Structures are given as structure tokens and as C-alpha cells.
């Protein structure tokens, strides 16, 4: 009879489920992981959104480089002049609000809504460094006001 009673007790204790402490531990672990993962994901999405702005400058970068190869001064290179594409304002892309060329530099302004918090209203500036001779390529210096700046921008 004692073996039957101990077997019944073992079955009852095995079928009880999780204790409150175990559930609280799981909730605490999920909370800690979320506290780390959410900010990292926002930085990741912010960098991806900035990449759109940098990618959209490629046509203007090529046109500015061609003009610089002819010996033109940086101050004479503006959006819509010569072979430079015109400036774009008011929704240039999904995350980009405007793109302006001024004195050879390309300034991209990100949107103020619908973007990651670390990108809201940020600007990306790509400034050309003219080559010493026409045979060399134009290099570009990137700077941004975004908190989650990409590795290519200082």
C-alpha cells in the first residue's frame, strides 16, 4: 500500500507545471534580452535607411566628378546646372526628404517621420575632394548628423 501511495504522490508532483518563480525568471530573461535587442535593431534599421540616402547620391557624384575633371571650380557646381541633376525636395525617396547640390557638396536630408528615431531629420553631406591632376579620381568625404551613422561616414 505504501508503494501505491508514493507513486500517486510522484504523479501529482510531476503534473503540477511551472512554479511562479520559474515563470518570473523567464519573464525577467525575456525583458533583459528585449532591452538589448530593441535599441540594436533601431540602429540597424537607421543605418539601412541612411544607406538609401547615400545610394541616391550616386548619379550626382558621377556628374560632379565629370565636371571637376574639366577643371571647374567647386563653387560653380550647383544642382540643375550643366550636367548636374536638379535638386529634389519634398520626398525624394522612401526615407529621404531632400537632396541638394551646393558648391559641389551633396546634402541629403532624411525625413522627420516614418524613419528610425536615430535618423529623424538627420543630414548626410558628401563633399568632393578634387584630384591633383585630371588623371586621378575624385574622392568623397562623408559626414552626417545621424546618431546611428554608417561606418563609411564620420
Region spans (language model):
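N-terminal leader/signal peptides at the extreme start of proteins
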Residues: 1-21
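Short alpha-helical segments used as structural interaction elements across diverse proteins
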Residues: 6-9, 13, 39, 44, ...
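A short, glycine- and basic residue-enriched loop/turn
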Residues: 15-21, 30, 47-48, 57
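Alpha-helical hydrophobic helix detector
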Residues: 24-40
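Contiguous, function-dense segments enriched for cysteine-driven chemistry
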Residues: 26, 45, 100
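Residue-level signature of catalytic and energy-coupling elements of molecular machines
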Residues: 31, 60, 126
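Conserved hydrophobic/amphipathic alpha-helical signal-anchor segments
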Residues: 35, 43-85
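Periplasmic/extracellular, small/polar-rich flexible segments of pilin-like filament-forming proteins
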Residues: 68-154
Amino acid at each position: 500500500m505504501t508503494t501505491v501511495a508514493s507513486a500517486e504522490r510522484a504523479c501529482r508532483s510531476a503534473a503540477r507545471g511551472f512554479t511562479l518563480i520559474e515563470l518570473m525568471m523567464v519573464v525577467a530573461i525575456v525583458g533583459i534580452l528585449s532591452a538589448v535587442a530593441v535599441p540594436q535593431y533601431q540602429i540597424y534599421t537607421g543605418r539601412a535607411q541612411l544607406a538609401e540616402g547615400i545610394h541616391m547620391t550616386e548619379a550626382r557624384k558621377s556628374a560632379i566628378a565629370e565636371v571637376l575633371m574639366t577643371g571647374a571650380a567647386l563653387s560653380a557646381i550647383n544642382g540643375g546646372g550643366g550636367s548636374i541633376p536638379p535638386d529634389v525636395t519634398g520626398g525624394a525617396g522612401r526615407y529621404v526628404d531632400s537632396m541638394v547640390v551646393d558648391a559641389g557638396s551633396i546634402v541629403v536630408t532624411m525625413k522627420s517621420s516614418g524613419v528610425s528615431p536615430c535618423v529623424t531629420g538627420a543630414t548626410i553631406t558628401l563633399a568632393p575632394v578634387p584630384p591633383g591632376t585630371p588623371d586621378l579620381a575624385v574622392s568623397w568625404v562623408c559626414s552626417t548628423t545621424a546618431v546611428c551613422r554608417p561606418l563609411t561616414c564620420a
